Amino acid sequence: METRKDDMEKRNDKSEPLLLPENGSDVSEEASWMVYLSTIIAVCGSYEFGTCVGYSAPTQFGIMEELNLSYSQFSVFGSILNMGAVLGAITSGKISDFIGRKGAMRLSSVISAIGWLIIYLAKGDVPLDFGRFLTGYGCGTLSFVVPVFIAEISPRKLRGALATLNQLFIVIGLASMFLIGAVVNWRTLALTGVAPCVVLFFGTWFIPESPRWLEMVGRHSDFEIALQKLRGPQANITREAGEIQEYLASLAHLPKATLMDLIDKKNIRFVIVGVGLMFFQQFVGINGVIFYAQQIFVSAGASPTLGSILYSIEQVVLTALGATLLIDRLGRRPLLMASAVGMLIGCLLIGNSFLLKAHGLALDIIPALAVSGVLVYIGSFSIGMGAIPWVIMSEIFPINLKGTAGGLVTVVNWLSSWLVSFTFNFLMIWSPHGTFYVYGGVCVLAIIFIAKLVPETKGRTLEEIQAMMM
């Protein structure tokens, strides 16, 4: 270790940029079973995220009837999740930097489990809302720390596929709430939300901490032990460990980043890419389409049940396809571009269906047009814009910025999510077809943004990505 430290000091004495190998042939590319176990444990947090978001839809009428809630009271219950998530997102970066990635996941699982138990025991709207707020806080923290943890433990050749499992398990969590909610009451459904929290809390005791975080806080021996576990006992980790240590050493003299540091010219590109992707992920209208899909089908004269079943199956299948086969073969940028173009087509199909209905034209094809538009839109979102912004967010930020910048982009995501959900009904009242033409316009802006600013990160180490963007 002393020799390695001396080497790093010699390198740092030279005023040379950090140059990393282009082909990375000497970097450990092996992944032991521990990488897969660690990822599966971590995405229990993603599944928990999905259950939180999906809980309100199948429970609305049961909760309102049993607790005698008005529509406005239930609307508060539904939306307060976002308020808790924003607070969780604001604090997530600092918490994960202070107590570690595993510590942040454990804390979030405990808070979420308490929230679910309060919902289960609720006798009125106040405890119901408080429990929902706590689950939202857990969601906000998990939405940041899970993709970051996966990115930091994964070999670069698997990082995209493993990181995309975050979105896949969010979708599975959403779908499970709809399926289980169809056969159990709302209190029992709340108890099912505790299960992933329990698995996540206890599972983190059996997996290593992020090696990069361990090195960042000066736990050098733990860093090497964790990296060796993740790469396998026979793997040669010398080069990979050296790159990580050299890169972190180059950042060691820098103070902890503040929000003002994010607008510094050497950091602004990281922030623009991260914030921009989160902005476009939401403002293409995804929450409006998902939350009100049944309303869209009914308004267009299509079967809401059939449409909901089709888009739920499609979302899981295509997210899995993107996670396992495409992201590390085709790359991030091509999938993002294809996703945005597909969503534009979906928006035009849905918008045209409402325009035809408003003018009483081609009434016999309107249901097929609306359903196909939603399916094209959801499918396109699932292969790219759903998962990849979180993957890129976890890859691009230097570790000294990751807490502050990652927290910022997660807050932007949750605030954008709330704003889209809140404004969707007002836009639909203004003009159903105009709503989707507006979202289509945002898709066009997203295509331009991706083409001009988003880097390709496939096949690069985290240190290479961050050096490339400096």
UniProtKB/Swiss-Prot annotation:
Name of one Pfam family that matches: Sugar_tr
GO MF annotation terms: sugar transmembrane transporter activity
Topology versus the membrane: Multi-pass membrane protein
Source organism superkingdom: Eukaryota
Regions of compositional bias (Basic and acidic residues) in chain numbering: 1-16
Positions of region (Disordered): 1-24
TM spans (from-to): 33-53, 73-93, 110-130, 133-153, 164-184, 188-208, 270-290, 307-327, 335-355, 373-393, 409-429, 434-454
Cellular compartments per GO CC: membrane; nucleus
Keywords noted in UniProt: Membrane, Sugar transport, Transmembrane, Transmembrane helix, Transport
Family indicated by similarity: Belongs to the major facilitator superfamily. Sugar transporter (TC 2.A.1.1) family.
Role this protein plays: Sugar transporter.
NCBIfam families: SP (TIGR00879)
Protein name: Sugar transporter ERD6-like 8
Organism listed in the record: Arabidopsis thaliana
